[in-house]
């Protein structure tokens, strides 16, 4: 009781600047977040009366994200859960910081029907891997709905917790671009990006949208993003994730020329596409986003996009990361499926990017440096890519399945022909401890249904 009262006093009355004097390794802003959200069991008070978390953390000093090969303990997963989903809102100086753009809930959110079935294998995978949430939707109903148990990360995750997209945001941006085309802001996927001054003198100027959407603008000599790689070849320390497009282009892409069009997956392309949408929609951008989510997706909770904390709009300050609640991720996937099935204008866009997909051609290809082969994580190891979606999954020959995938094992598979959707939100995935069963959790439900 005494500890609780002391912590309550500190939470209410200790100013932030006293916490901020703590060493970086103690993560004082994270400690304050724990206190502010009632996770007092993870905080102790030291001899000087300063609150410190009591978790045993192993945090990468080099990367913002969990290194792919690492097998973090539960304590470290708690920290990264905070880092991925909340730290950008706390002013934490030790992590990425973005300004949120909030999309309010729809007036009449889509209501799911449930016919829940118990699947012991899914339960075991959610309990033992890095999975935060698992949803399976078929023929208009949710059949499986599992969330991380309390002893894993369940005390931090509920139906109102917004979960980070990671690279699933690439596909979200493509879906938004489809709406921009259908509302007349952009002509079509063969339109040329030749009207945005930010890209002038760079290889991205005069590119066709379809080449950008397919991750094939011929930028592989300048940017390389694979595994835990930094991205910009000329400067491994530069992070485009926290810089506007104008700055990145000015530093590293001036007078660059397009190389051969081959699949070269990287997040900068998506950030350029996102900011091009902002450029074309102008002052209508936020109204445009609200219309998509409130009228089409029919989200139940706030959806959060982000942008840089500083810089002018014309510099390209938008980021492609997005955060939705677990069921709103399913609502978004269902909206995509409905568009495809109903052959709406956006549905025709989705069909077109599927038709225009390109082979990844990664088999046997060597990474930069020539000492390792390209190997994508199994959950997005597909044969082709198109319009910022993964296509042609193993074992699903001749099936039209749209795949969204993001670091940590985040994955959504949408079988647009058979009305099946799998949504996995996950914090870590690798080839050892945190490797979930891709075949049984993702591919088999899409292939066979239930």
Report each predicted region and the residues it spans.
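N-terminal leader/targeting segments and the immediately adjacent pre-domain N-terminus
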Residues: 20-155, 186, 214, 440-450
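Active-site helix/loop module of the DD-peptidase/beta-lactamase fold
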Residues: 182-220, 254, 281-320, 324, ...
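Catalytic-site signature segments of enzymes, centered on catalytic residues
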Residues: 159-160, 224-320
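Active-site-proximal alpha-helical segments within enzyme catalytic domains
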Residues: 269-276, 320-345, 410-427
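Active-site Gly/Thr loop motif
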Residues: 299-301, 356-421
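Active-site SXXK
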Residues: 140, 161-188, 212, 273-277, ...
């Amino acid at each position: 009781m005494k500890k609780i009262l002391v912590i309550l006093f500190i939470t209410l009355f200790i100013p932030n600047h006293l916490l901020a004097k703590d060493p970086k390794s103690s993560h004082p802003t994270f400690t304050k977040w724990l206190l502010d959200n009632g996770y007092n069991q993870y905080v102790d008070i030291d001899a000087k009366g300063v609150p410190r978390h009591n978790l045993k953390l192993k945090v990468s000093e080099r990367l913002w994200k969990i290194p792919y090969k690492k097998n973090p303990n539960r304590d470290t997963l708690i920290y990264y859960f905070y880092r991925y989903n909340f730290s950008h809102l706390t002013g934490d100086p030790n992590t990425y910081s973005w300004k949120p753009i909030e999309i309010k809930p729809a007036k009449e959110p889509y209501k799911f029907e449930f016919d829940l079935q118990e699947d012991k294998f899914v339960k075991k995978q959610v309990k033992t891997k890095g999975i935060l949430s698992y949803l399976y939707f078929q023929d208009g109903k949710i059949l499986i709905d599992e969330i991380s148990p309390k002893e894993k990360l369940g005390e931090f995750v509920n139906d109102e917790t917004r979960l980070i997209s990671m690279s699933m945001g690439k596909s979200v941006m493509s879906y938004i671009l489809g709406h921009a085309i259908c509302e007349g802001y952009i002509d079509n996927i063969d339109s040329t990006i030749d009207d945005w001054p930010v890209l002038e003198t760079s290889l991205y100027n005069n590119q066709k949208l379809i080449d950008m959407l397919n991750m094939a603008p011929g930028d592989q000599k300048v940017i390389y993003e694979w595994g835990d790689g930094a991205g910009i070849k000329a400067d491994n320390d530069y992070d485009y994730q926290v810089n506007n497009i104008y700055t990145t282009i000015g530093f590293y892409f001036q007078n660059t020329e397009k190389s051969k069009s081959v699949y070269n997956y990287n997040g900068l392309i998506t950030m350029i596409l996102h900011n091009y949408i902002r450029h074309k929609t102008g002052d209508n951008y936020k109204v445009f986003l609200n219309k998509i989510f409130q009228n089409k997706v029919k989200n139940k909770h706030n959806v959060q996009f982000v942008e840089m904390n500083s810089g002018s709009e014309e510099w390209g300050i938008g980021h492609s990361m997005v955060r939705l609640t677990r069921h709103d991720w399913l609502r978004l996937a269902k909206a995509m499926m409905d568009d495809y099935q109903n052959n709406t204008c956006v549905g025709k866009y989705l069909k077109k990017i599927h038709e225009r997909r390109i082979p990844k051609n990664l088999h046997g290809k060597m990474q930069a440096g020539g000492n390792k082969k390209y190997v994508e994580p199994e959950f997005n190891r597909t044969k082709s890519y198109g319009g910022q979606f993964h296509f042609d999954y193993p074992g699903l020959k001749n099936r039209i399945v749209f795949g969204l995938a993001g670091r940590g094992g985040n994955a959504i598979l949408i079988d647009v022909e058979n009305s099946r959707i799998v949504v996995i939100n996950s914090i870590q995935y690798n080839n050892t401890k945190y490797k979930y069963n891709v075949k049984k959790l993702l591919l088999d439900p899409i292939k066979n249904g239930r």
